[in-house]
Every structure is written in C-alpha cells, then in structure tokens.
Amino acid sequence: DALTPLTTRVLEAADRAKRTLDAGVTSIRDIGGTPRGFKLAAQRGLFPSPRMNIAVSIISQTGGHGDYALPSGITHPWMAAMLGYQTEWPNSVGDGIEGVTRVARETFRAGADFLKICTTGGLSLPDEDPNHTQFIVEEIKAMVAEAKAHGSYVAAHAQGLQGIKNALEGGVRSIEHGYFMDEEVADQMVAQGTYLVPTAHLTNGRLRRKAEDPASLPEDVIARSNTVADNLKMAYEKGVTIAMGTDVGVAEHGTNAEDLTALVDLTGMSPMQAIVAATRTASECNRKDHEFGTLTVGKLADLLIVDGDPLADISMLENKAHLLMIMQGGNAHKDLINS
C-alpha cells in the first residue's frame, strides 16, 4: 500500500522471489512492476530468485487498464508508492503514435526486456470492462515496431474479443489471458504463431469451488468462468500455442504449479504437455529458448528432482515438500538428496 516505505516493499519483493524459486520456478517473465535495479540485485546473487526478464511497467492509454489515476484525481494506492520514483518506473501512460512511441522508448531505457501493453479493460476493478478496447491498432503497431527496433517484442493484456483482434492485427507476440476469444481468433493465432498465456488458475479455482459448494459463487461468475474454460479448451484443440503463466495479484507468489493443474483440468492436456508449456514453450515465448527451457547440452542446467510421478498426478508439484532438489544454472538452490 501507499503507506509502506519503498525499502520495505523491496524486501517483501525479495521474499516473494525466493518463494517462487522455492516452488521450483527457476526463470520468470515478469510482466509489469519489477524495476531494473531489482533484477540486477537478483543477478548479483543478493537474494535467491528466479532469473528474470522484465517489462518494468504496464503500458496503458489514458484511462486504461494500466492507468492508476482514479476519477478523483488521486493515484490508486497500489501504484502511488512506485510512481514517486520515476527513474525506476517511468511514465507508462501514452496516447497517439508519438505518445506511445515515447513511452515505449522510455520503458526500454528503464531496463525493460520487452513491452507489456493493455488492449482491453480487465475484471479486477469495478469500473472496468474487458469488452472495452484500449489503444487503436495504429498505436499497437507503433509499439510493436519500437519493440522490434530494440530486438524485442510486445505482450498484450487482452481479455475481450475485439481487443484481442486489435492486438493480433497490431502484431503482438503473446496474448495474456485471452478469456473471451472465439474460433476466428484462435485460427488467426495459429496462423500468426501468436502465443496464448491463459492464466488459467483463477478459472480452475472458481470451478472447483463451485463443484464443492454450489452456493459459494454468484451465477454470473460461474457462467463467465465456464465461458473462459470452454474458450481455452477450444484454443488448445485448434492448436494455439499455449505457454503457462500466472496472474500475480490474483494468485499468491510461489503457487505457480497451480497453473499446471489448471491446464490439465481445463484443456485436456496431458501432464507432460503442461510441463512442456511451462518450460520449453514458455522459454520460446520469451525468446530465451537458446538459454534454457530444455535439458540440452550447452543450455543452463535448470532441473527439478521430485519424490513422486507428476505424469500420474500433476498436482503433486503444488506441494513444495515433494521437491527434493531445485537446480538453477547448475547450482543447487535446494538439495534434500545430498544433505
């Protein structure tokens, strides 16, 4: 919150990074919020952490999903503390070709490895609607062009149908969420080679909760969750390339393996296919497959040794007690085998 000193927030973030590594996640793509200095500290080994690729900020149009200025004129407490440190988190709100190009360049200057933009509203705030489109196609194309100029790419928060279409027309590399896509969009994603990161744990959790207690959630929430689940299964069956990813702020840090279970439950993936979505495919999405993502000679030695069979029960990976060894870059972060 806005009353917490920045130094406290940094130490809290370091603890969250350790929890994520403790869960067996050796590399992450942080899609908004992590500044370059934090990544540098992790690289220097100042605290245990997954290696990071970072977007630094979430780029938004004025009044969009990543604009935290409230109608009252007050900045939302989520971001108020951050926005006082403009050298770490540059302005991330832009409009028009010139405006978004400048924001993109400033974001790369601040240390971003890629750009995260919002082409729709979201579901987390009462005044948002995922069906509202954000950024026109020409603005999206301008940011994609700027990313390409930096040898990078754009990931798009996109939930509603038209905003997903706009993001695809603009040339983004990955669609984050993609909840309300249709078959035409799925076909286009296959044709363009666009990745889908469905952040499926929330939907799966809601449907499980409904099965256990039918009265626990409103009917409109269940109906929406069923639609999202149906669309994800459709996308998988049509051959959309799916990379596993979580949604921080909705999921606790260190619970990443819940998304593996969700992919198996919602799409019909085998446990091995879900593991591939979290390793090889995720590294390809992040353009890091030459460094990690598979057990290949010459790549970084990241591996887990577990005391069970995740191919028989993928959910076992949610329990950290089952992780006997976590190796990151050839170094054992956790080793219960030789200790």
Give the role of each language-model region.
Residues 1-12, 90-91, 216-227:
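A short acidic, glycine-rich active-site loop
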Residues 1-44, 63-70, 138, 162, ...:
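Metal-associated gating/positioning segment near the N- to mid-region
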Residues 13, 100, 136, 140, ...:
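Aromatic/hydrophobic pocket-lining residues that form the small-molecule binding cavity
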Residues 24, 28-29, 115, 175, ...:
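Hydrophobic residues within beta-strands of alpha/beta enzymes
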Residues 43-216:
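Metal-coordinating catalytic core of metallo-dependent amide/deamination hydrolases
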Residues 149, 153, 213-216, 224-310:
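His/Asp/Glu-enriched, well-ordered alpha-helical/loop segment
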Residues 278-280, 297-339:
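C-terminal cap of metal-dependent C-N hydrolases
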